[in-house]
Amino acid sequence: EWRVSQLQIRESLIDNIGEDAIRRFLRSRGIEKKDLGQEFKYFVSNAVGIDIMEEEFEEFCYNHLMYGKRKLVRVFEIANKRKITDDELWLKALKKDFLWDSLNMCKILKTDVSSSDDWKVASVKTVDDKRGEVESICILFQCYIRVTKKISKDHEWCTYIPVEVDLK
């Protein structure tokens, strides 16, 4: 029986996570690639939404992109955190700059960048403390990159930039 998922997984997402990591994830769910002629992105697209839930795969992508092997860690001390613990200020800034309307939403599978729209938010997750103030916020940015070369062909791809702000 031939089944086709409506979701199309982008090759850039596979490149950023790594085909091996995605294979291991799918294999742990009992899903193996059987059609040797099928491109990997089509295999993943068909598996997501048919064999596994879209939300489960998106959570895997989020964890891998935020905390996986490609993460660069920099630590800064924030002198005055009072102004940046307000949910409304974060939401206002995200809405103004990225048309983002939630402090807890993941759209990794549906966010795509291009040369004309090169910087987007793919996910935001916040944790509030007992007083309702932001304790931590994780923002996953998706960025379009184009490298122009004089001699050879230009290269373009997208990358994900994880930012975690811990205000404890």
Region annotations inferred by a language model:
Residues 1-163, 168:
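Intrinsically disordered, low-complexity polar/charged tails and linkers
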